[in-house]
Every structure is written in C-alpha cells, then in structure tokens.
C-alpha cells in the first residue's frame, strides 16, 4: 500500500498506518466509528521501572484489583459528564470495562461508542481510588447518578493511556477490514 508506506515515512515511531482505503468525501473517521477501545496501564509496585515510564502510570500504593473489577462493571451502560459540557451530547455508552493484573501491571480496558474529553482517564482515576480503598465499588452507581464531574475521582495522568483500536460501522462502499 503506497499511501501507508508514504505516511509511515513521515510519522513518529509510535504511530503506524497499517492500511488505507478510499472513502466517500463526506465520510469522517471520528464521527462514523461505532466502537473505540482504550487501555490504561498502571505499574503497581514498590519501585519505578524506567523501561515502562512512557506507557504506564507508576503507582506504588497497593491496589485491590478485585474491588476495581467489581466497580468496573457498574461503568458498563450509559455514562454522562457535567451538564455544562461543550459537546452536542454528553451521553456515551460503555460496552465493556474490565480490570486485569499480570505481574505488576494492572490494565483497565474500556470499550465504548465514544468518549468525552478525559473520560477514560477519569474512569482510571476513579478505579484507582476504588483499588486504594477511598471509594467502595458500589459507590460508582451514585457517582454516575450525580452527573457531576466533581463526584468522580481525579483525572489519571495521560502516559498510562493507549488507544487500542477503532471499529467502524459497516459501509457498503468502504472496506474497513484491518483498519485501525
């Protein structure tokens, strides 16, 4: 694919175009996707790991992953932000939210139809508070019902966040197989 090759010559090393296809002039990748998946990774151990400093958030206090997993289930469904947000609609659907741990890495994986500004980082910050015992898993329902940004946990730092993929709606004239 000549276009992918040309783009990859000019993009930074952490961004790769794996494929391309022709689309109608009015097609917009931001607004015509059906699902996005993000992962937020937390390095949960006593000491930092320099090799993971760019793709994980280092958090040295112990976190209860089981509590975080229980809380994550409450996030599935519709989520909202403050009423005065500067977007057309504040309603977003979370299809799946999970928390797993492998070695010293805790991964929060969130799939939804779209995300508000900092939404995944706010979810991560809130789940970190759950894991640290400041919030009980069951309180997530109250936080969502409040529809108030101040009720949720802090915004977690950006360097733990990675977009894992985008799924596009089926278009009869567009081949989106393998496009991320």
Spans of features found by a protein language model:
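Structured-RNA-binding interfaces characteristic of tRNA pseudouridine synthases
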Residues: 1-180
């Amino acid at each position: 694919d000549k276009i992918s090759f040309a783009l990859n010559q000019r993009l930074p090393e952490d961004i790769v175009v794996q494929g391309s296809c022709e689309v109608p002039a009015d097609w917009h990748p931001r607004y015509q996707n059906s699902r996005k998946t993000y992962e937020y990774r937390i390095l949960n151990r006593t000491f930092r790991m320099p090799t993971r400093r760019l793709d994980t958030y280092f958090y040295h206090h112990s976190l209860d992953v089981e509590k975080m997993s229980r809380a994550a289930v409450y996030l599935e469904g519709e989520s909202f932000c403050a009423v005065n947000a500067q977007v057309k609609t504040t309603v977003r659907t979370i299809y799946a939210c999970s928390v797993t741990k492998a070695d010293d890495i805790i991964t929060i994986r969130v799939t939804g139809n779209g995300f508000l500004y900092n939404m995944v980082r706010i979810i991560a910050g809130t789940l970190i508070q759950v894991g640290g015992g400041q919030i009980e898993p069951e309180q997530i329902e109250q936080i969502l019902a409040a529809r108030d940004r101040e009720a949720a946990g802090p915004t977690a730092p950006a360097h733990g966040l990675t977009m894992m993929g985008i799924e596009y709606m089926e278009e009869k004239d567009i081949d989106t197989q393998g496009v991320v």
